[in-house]
Design a protein with these regions (language model features):
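Short, hinge-like loop/turn segments at secondary-structure boundaries
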Residues: 1-4, 113-114
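Generic recognition of stable, solvent-exposed alpha-helical segments in well-folded globular domains
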Residues: 4, 82, 121-124
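Serine-dependent amide/ester hydrolase catalytic core
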Residues: 6-90
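Structural helix-boundary/capping segments
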Residues: 34-44, 51, 89-133
Length: 133
């Protein structure tokens, strides 16, 4: 995904480099270290992962996970995307929704994940859960 994101953002990075935060710039720029062969290998690995997840979740409509691996990140500190990356790679629709607050009154969230082309189910479930929190 990094190569795809960097390819998309290249013209904007050139014209508006200072508009990007350091975290985002570093992430996008690191993607330029990959070549075409790396990209093709990554696509093959992506397809293998997709097949395994499709098999693993064949009997489930939705998956519920944490949104973050730790407490709510501060605004000036980027958070980990560890729990989101897998589903971005798969191309599966996912949404993070608020789910109460921690002991410091900071918001907590959960991530809902649906199978491909199940965005309507995902959004209905998210709306229902959010209406109770």
């Amino acid at each position: 995904l990094a190569v795809e994101a960097a390819t998309f953002h290249t013209p904007y990075l050139i014209e508006n480099y200072s508009d990007y935060g350091d975290f985002c710039k570093n992430r996008l720029l690191s993607a330029f270290a990959f070549n075409g062969e790396d990209f093709v290998k990554a696509q093959k690995i992506r397809q293998t992962i997709r097949s395994k997840w499709n098999h693993f979740l064949k009997d489930f409509d939705l998956l519920v996970t944490h949104s973050q691996p730790e407490k709510t990140p501060l605004l000036d500190k980027p958070s980990s995307t560890r729990f989101m990356n897998s589903f971005n790679i798969l191309g599966w629709p996912a949404i993070s929704i608020p789910m109460g607050k921690d002991k410091d009154a900071l918001p907590l969230g959960i991530q809902l994940v649906a199978k491909p082309w199940q965005e309507e189910l995902l959004l209905r479930a998210a709306q229902t859960i959010e209406s109770y929190s």
